[in-house]
């Protein structure tokens, strides 16, 4: 509850909470989905292998980062997958809306246990690192959405699509609230 109360006061695009427990993840997911529906917030959260499948456009489930060794400063150090969610949040927040995160280089990874079936992981709504052509890269940039409907197609599983839609919606809502509401007569 304290986390959600704090989130209501912040404006963010991507949130990483390495220490979040199952109840916290559920509370954050519920808040993000409700806030998006009411056009109050447009954020997304990244978690490492949450206990329950989120099945949400708002949640990115990082997976496949066991025995992770990273080198950020010239020294190799061990990190948990949960700690690495912060780096992924930074990557996603820093990308242009014209670029997908798929195959983004992860130069800091020295070694990592890679999942054997990256397509199955992506189809299950998991964002994973890959090792291709001698380099670590992000796999298919997907969120945790797996349940598709007539109005929610496979396009909504792509991080870039959801982020672009959120950017457009947030710009429209912000412009309306800041430049029109209370400034013009409604006849």
Where would I find each of the regions flagged by the language model?
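A glycine- and small-residue-enriched flexible loop/hinge signal that marks low-structured segments
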Residues: 4-184
């Amino acid at each position: 509850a304290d986390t959600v109360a704090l989130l209501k006061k912040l404006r963010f695009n991507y949130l990483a909470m390495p220490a979040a427990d199952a109840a916290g993840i559920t509370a954050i997911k519920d808040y993000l989905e409700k806030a998006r529906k009411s056009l109050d917030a447009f954020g997304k959260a990244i978690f490492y292998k949450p206990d329950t499948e989120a099945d949400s456009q708002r949640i990115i489930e990082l997976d496949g980062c066991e025995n992770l060794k990273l080198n950020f400063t010239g020294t190799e150090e061990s990190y948990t997958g949960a700690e690495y969610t912060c780096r992924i949040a930074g990557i996603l927040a820093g990308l242009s809306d014209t670029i997908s995160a798929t195959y983004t280089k992860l130069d800091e990874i020295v070694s990592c246990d890679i999942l054997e079936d990256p397509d199955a992981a992506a189809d299950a709504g998991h964002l994973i690192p890959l090792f291709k052509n001698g380099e670590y890269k992000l796999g298919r940039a997907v969120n945790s959405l797996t349940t598709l409907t007539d109005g929610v197609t496979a396009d909504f599983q792509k991080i870039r699509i959801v982020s672009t839609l959120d950017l457009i919606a947030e710009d429209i809502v912000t412009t309306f609230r800041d430049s029109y509401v209370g400034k013009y007569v409604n006849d």
